[in-house]
UniProtKB/Swiss-Prot annotation:
Signal peptide bounds: 1-19
Limits of the PLD phosphodiesterase domain: 145-172, 373-399
Keyword Glycosyltransferase: no
Entry's Gene Ontology BP terms: lipid catabolic process; macropinocytosis
Glycan-modified residues: N50, N223, N336, N394
Ways its activity is controlled: Inhibited by butan-1-ol.
Record's protein name: Phospholipase D Y
Residues at the catalytic site: H150, K152, D157
SMART domains named among the record's database cross-references: PLDc
Role this protein plays: Hydrolyzes membrane phospholipids, such as PtdCho (phosphatidylcholine), producing the free headgroup and PtdOH (phosphatidic acid; signaling molecule on its own).
SUPFAM superfamilies the record matches: Phospholipase D/nuclease
Family per record: Belongs to the phospholipase D family.
Reaction it catalyzes: a 1,2-diacyl-sn-glycero-3-phosphocholine + H2O = a 1,2-diacyl-sn-glycero-3-phosphate + choline + H(+)
């Protein structure tokens, strides 16, 4: 850890002198590091995965040596405690207990969450705070005007991290389909991710946000024009149990380029790429294929009254398909809480040559009663022939302009092939339905 901290100090020194000049020591500095895809597969689905979100989080937390930083919308890891064990509530209990155990062995644990509400109370984080764990809440509406802190972020020892769709919720481990990226032993990239966490952590004490200048302490180390170059081992497909996953992955060290993007614009510190800019770059740079999995998609706002039109992403997808003959495939979630404004836009997209849209429908659990706000594909990712985008945001204006979120953007052929295999697995699964069905 002394080496990791020294490395981060060196990187920050070079960046603060000139954020466009990155020390040569940052290149290949993740020797021995790994990158993996972690998934939650709802119980009862006939889909296999190499690494579950539960196992990834347990590995990160139980192996922490010095620090654990957690940034989440809310915490309901114990929410399944009173349910029949068949629902999988124990998975959330495991994570909660691992956090408590880490604190008890002297690990510095920090939690930042959205301001609690009646819908998302802070019962569990109050319990953790009483044990001595540091907990802060961001009054997001006061700082931004609307929206929430919607991020899902774990940082361990300033050298390992998780970014993805899974909430700190037992159902995100057992009853909801999720996907995220796990980085281990990669202080280069995690140093940059830690900057985003520090923004959240300190913003909890702000009465207003900095206007156009977060200061040099928050300058991004990398962005979409100056990416981190990393030597990482990707063993996602070792011992692959899914017969539908046709990529066998070598598990050898390869060079990766990668950067972190953030939303909303109010949290874009100097040199930081905006999440919407990263997403748009991926679409606009695709020459052959764009495959998208996201829970909600609409070229509008989703939470305003009235909602307003925002065709930025929609126009880019249509242009890619029509002007460049890019093959676009979209898997959008349909569940009990799908907004009634969403289907019309998907039906329209599906009429465009080279665009195919399908619903992904997670069937009800085999045991009653059914648990509200579960049984849905909550993953948020895009893969093109060139890159992978894995984020925390749904695709409507609100998530990019007023809501707190992150994305990891990865450039590596093997990793892209693996994410593409996951998309293909889901696209060809029995859980998709024609867009015309709803």
């Amino acid at each position: 850890m002394i080496i990791n901290r020294l490395f981060i100090i060196i990187v920050l020194f070079f960046v603060n002198v000139n954020s466009k000049i990155i020390s040569e020591s940052t290149l290949n500095s993740c020797q021995g590091g790994t990158i993996q895809i972690a998934e939650s597969i709802p119980l009862g689905l006939d889909i296999s995965t190499n690494l579950s979100t539960h196992d990834a989080w347990m590995d990160l937390i139980t192996n922490a040596q010095e620090s654990i930083d957690l940034g989440f919308f809310y915490f309901t890891l114990l929410g399944g405690s009173d349910l029949d064990p068949v629902y999988g509530g124990q998975l959330g209990i495991d994570i909660f207990n691992a956090i408590v155990e880490a604190h008890s062995r002297g690990i510095n644990v920090r939690i930042v969450q959205n301001e609690p509400s009646e819908s998302f109370p802070d019962t569990e984080t109050q319990t953790l705070a009483k044990l001595g764990i540091q907990v802060r809440s961001i009054d997001w509406v006061s700082l931004v005007g609307s929206g929430v802190l919607h991020t899902k972020l774990i940082i361990i020892d300033e050298s390992s991290a998780y970014v993805g769709s899974a909430n700190a919720d037992w159902s995100s481990l057992a009853q909801v389909k999720e996907l995220g990226i796990v980085l281990k032993n990669c202080p280069t990239m995690v140093a940059d991710t830690e900057i985003a966490f520090q923004q959240y952590w300190n913003a909890a004490d702000f009465t207003s946000l900095p206007i156009n200048d977060w200061g040099s302490n928050y300058q991004a180390l990398f962005n979409n024009t100056n990416m981190a170059s990393l030597s990482l081992n990707n063993n996602n497909n070792n011992n692959n149990k899914n017969k539908n996953n046709d990529n066998d992955g070598s598990g050898t060290n390869q060079m990766y380029e990668m950067f972190l993007a953030v939303s909303p614009p109010q949290f874009q510190s100097t040199y930081r790429t905006g999440d919407i800019d990263a997403l748009m770059d991926a679409i606009n740079n695709a020459d052959q294929s764009i495959c998208i999995t996201v829970m909600d998609y609409t070229p509008t706002t989703l939470y305003n009254d009235p909602n307003t039109y925002w065709p930025l992403i929609d126009n880019a997808l249509r242009a890619a398909a029509f002007n460049r003959n890019v093959q676009v495939r979209m898997l959008i979630s349909h569940w009990n809480y799908t907004s009634p404004i969403i289907p019309q836009w998907l039906h329209s997209l599906n009429q465009v040559d080279n665009i195919q849209v399908r619903w992904f429908v997670v069937p009800d659990f085999s045991t009653n009663p059914q648990i509200p706000y579960t049984r849905v594909n909550h993953a948020k990712f895009m893969v093109t022939e060139k890159q992978s985008y894995v984020g925390t945001s749904n695709w409507s204006q609100d998530y990019f302009t007023v809501t707190g979120g992150l994305s990891y953007n990865v450039f590596n052929n093997d990793f892209t092939n693996q994410l593409q295999s996951i998309f293909n697995r889901d696209w060809n699964s029995p859980y998709t339905q024609p867009i015309q069905n709803f």
